[in-house]
Amino acid sequence: MMVYSEAGGVSKTTAAVSVAMTAAEAGHRTVLIDLDPRAASTKWTRIAPVGEGLHVGAILGAKEEPTGWAEDLAVQSTWHPLLRVIPSARDLSNRESDRDDYAELRLKTSLVDLQADVVVIDCANRQGGPLTLSALHAADRVLYAATASDSGVDGVTGAQRTVDTFRRSMARLGAAATIEEAGVAMTRDGTGFLSYAEQDAIDQVRELAPIIEPIVPHLAIVPEVRMAGEWYGAYRKGAPIRDAYTEVMRKVIR
């Protein structure tokens, strides 16, 4: 499953990491793939590649067929024994200029024989391009991430447009696009009453795609633990967020 928005600052990485971690806590063997050159998931989970340059960019830039490489590059997380991470790096951006034939299929090919029940892809906030295409080919579902804001609405709108374009392109080729929309993981500030602007944004997003309840509160502990490389669910103050994402995870993970 890919977690996607075309806007920045809409809790996309928080959603991806949270769904992956709560899936592991629920007993699923989980692999989180950081497909964003910002490497936010990688930095948060404090994951280092198994060797120099052996991050997700090695898969996307492979000159030979990378069958099964994901299993080799997935690194065990210290957060949970059932969570592994395929890290990213800034030079992943070099892959965005890659025009090799079938380059967009390398990530999907690498997942062959991966020992995992759940794969979560933290996507870059791109309007298409090789990184997004790689995720679209590899994933069977897309979970949109949004905040209750104008940026959240714009991010979902753009992401849906990209997914629709991908589906139409596959149809023109006579190939089935298997990716489905799982819905929207929605975040809002705090736990108090919704402001008019927040409610308006939520209503606009709901017209685009189903919002997966509950709406997740964004609390100060999230940026604090991200700086420390820790899981907010290990702290009492993080319980409301963990519980909300656990419910979201149960609704989107098959």
What residues fall within each predicted segment?
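P-loop NTP-binding core
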Residues: 1-254
